[in-house]
Amino acid sequence: MSNSITLTLKNYLGRMPTINEYHMLKSQVRNIQKIMFFNKDIFISLIKKNKKKFFSEIKSSPSEIKTHILEYFLKQQKTSSIGKLYTIIELQTILVSSYTDVLGVLTTKSPYVFPSNIKYEPHSMKKIAHDILTSINVATISEKVMGRHNVSNLVTNVNLLMEEYLRRHNKSCICYGSYSLYLLNPSIKYGDIDILQTNSRIFLINLAFLIKFITGHNVMLLKVPYLKNYMVLRDNEDKHIIDSFNVRQETMHAIPKILIDNIYIVDPTFQLLSMIKMFSQIDRLEDLAKNQEKATIKLATLLEYVRIKHGIILNGNVTNMPMPASFNYEKRIVTVDASKYNFSFKKCFVYLDENSLSSDILDLNADDAIDFENVSNSVFLINDEVMYTYFSNTILMSSKNEIHEISARGVSAHILMYQILTDGDFLIPLSDIINSLMFKEKTPIFNIIPRDKKTGKHGIINIEKDIITH
């Protein structure tokens, strides 16, 4: 056994390593040295500054914060489990390697914010938005509580931090949803801030430690198997703090976005299509039944943005939207006629089962499928003027053989999202799909085709219990 490795492990573990510990941990010596040489005084100072700036009303003293930090950096001395030691080393390495650049930088002087003149007061759109939502408000109110509705008291503090984070890291992190629309229209209320970023795991681990060191309470990261590259941070009462989708850099580059007050948000045109698509998901219609007014102001803001940005006239005149679609129950495939538009395909096969799509793409022997990850929740393949894609929401039926217009429009919106992501033609179909929302009567739901059931285990990062599962 190497004397230098043995000495390093001895100093780190606070005891002489066993032979098993030596052989299992010797590959981690470089990381261990990085942890041991880490300037914890500077780190403690950064945490205190983060606390003062973003968590000022939380009652924890500087000495308590220091104790929480020092205790964690000595945690390896209280276990002999190799699995736990690996977890502690991995998490400590992430902290010492990335915290300063990810969250510590937020304590330095803020760069100048270039105030945006993009503000919308969509008074004229509220009536249109209200009428649209009234016509699709066809679900009954559900009493089940979704995880996104069970929010932590820490959300306000984390939102304050996120506003600064989005400005400092606007090349790698963008936002969408209610907060992004609040930046366009300050009358919109928001809860947590929805984000897409290229280093989601590192960010959330650092944030988890910041909260733990300030509050002294455990927080936990969960990876959900049925959402691609998604992680959620929950507090010690299992309440939602923040979640984040991770995307590759090339996907981030493809996302249409606009800059408001030094923060990049997903282009509201794309967000409008996403909203139309999500109305096909029965859960979202149940949310609408609970609070139509909340959705009205969001939709009105999106419509006003699109009207001004693209010069779209809202008069209800439309002939080709939603695109004609039929459903094959046995194959669980929606077939869409896209021939009326200037697309690179004439027909779309929209699969409700992702594995079936993957299998058929393999059979086609095609290797040019494009994956936009959770931005579209699907790959897209164009082959012989046919699009192959996956739709991750429920499909609503208005009769046994007829797709409900809400879902037909949702599928059409999904296809238009591809057009925008690939810089294809979309203005005429965009105008059509928006106008297809207007002057409609309610159509009851006859049947609901369930969405794809994803299997798999939840991944967990539990700092308190030294657990990382994938």
Curated annotation (Swiss-Prot):
InterPro entries: PolyA_pol_cat_Poxvir, PolyA_pol_cat_sf, PolyA_pol_nucTrfase_Poxvir, PolyA_pol_nucTrfase_sf_Poxvir, Poxvirus_polyA_pol_cat_C, Poxvirus_polyA_pol_cat_N, Poxvirus_polyA_pol_cat_N_sf. It comes from the Viruses. It catalyses: RNA(n) + ATP = RNA(n)-3'-adenine ribonucleotide + diphosphate. It is an enzyme of class 2 (transferase). GO terms for biological process: mRNA processing. Its EC number is 2.7.7.19. The active site is at D192, D194. One of its GO terms (molecular function) is ATP binding. It holds the Pfam family Pox_polyA_pol_C. Keywords: ATP-binding, mRNA processing, Nucleotide-binding, Transcription, Transferase. Belongs to the poxviridae poly(A) polymerase catalytic subunit family. Heterodimer of a large (catalytic) subunit and a small (regulatory) subunit. This is Poly(A) polymerase catalytic subunit. It comes from Yaba-like disease virus (YLDV).
